[in-house]
């Protein structure tokens, strides 16, 4: 994975502003997805052409009208930022379908801490070690209390370029790493096939 020996340092004031902007942006994207898969007011009001929605390769027609648990569709967003000539932060792109890179952040930070402990001692570097646990907590928050299923991280398999990340995140979250062939649906529920029998999957 990519490793930058001299990572970009962002001061706390800038970071607070970036976080506020990213939270606002992801909330707006969440509202947009809820509308596009629900009442479609943005299309009806002419904000976005219906043709653009219907011909988009990422538009999943089978989930139109389905309200996800807790009403949330976005649990992890990959937002690429750049700083322009004037020093302002700009969004280069959003990735909501299959964002990657979280494990790289965690592994890079752990490596940097071992490589340059004095830099971490002399600066108040924000801790990111809990990021995978925050993701796990966000996923489990949508599961009803009575549900005894597990969390499964679905991966295309070892041949996929992001497989190492999938394995690392699953391990960090305490989730099961599965491929499509490991899963079946029965009685309107997803089950994971294991050597010990079928195990329900909650998320």
Regions found by a protein language model. Give the residues of each.
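Preference for protein termini
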Residues: 1-203
């Amino acid at each position: 994975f990519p490793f930058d020996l001299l990572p970009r340092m962002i001061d706390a004031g800038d970071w607070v502003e970036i976080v506020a902007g990213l939270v606002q942006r992801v909330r707006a994207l969440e509202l947009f997805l809820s509308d596009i898969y629900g009442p479609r007011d943005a299309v009806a009001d002419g904000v976005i052409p219906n043709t653009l929605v219907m011909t988009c390769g990422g538009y999943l027609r089978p989930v139109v009208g389905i309200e996800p648990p807790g009403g949330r569709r976005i649990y992890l967003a990959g937002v690429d930022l750049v700083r322009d000539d004037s020093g302002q932060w700009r969004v280069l792109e959003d990735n909501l379908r299959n964002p990657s890179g979280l494990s790289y952040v965690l592994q890079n930070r752990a490596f940097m801490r071992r490589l340059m402990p004095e830099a971490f001692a002399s600066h108040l570097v924000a801790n990111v070690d809990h990021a995978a646990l925050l993701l796990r907590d966000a996923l489990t928050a949508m599961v009803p209390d009575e549900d005894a299923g597990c969390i499964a991280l679905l991966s295309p398999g070892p041949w996929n370029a992001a497989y190492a990340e999938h394995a690392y995140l699953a391990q960090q979250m305490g989730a099961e790493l599965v491929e499509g062939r490991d899963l079946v649906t029965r009685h309107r529920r997803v089950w994971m096939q294991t050597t010990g029998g079928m195990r329900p999957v909650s998320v």
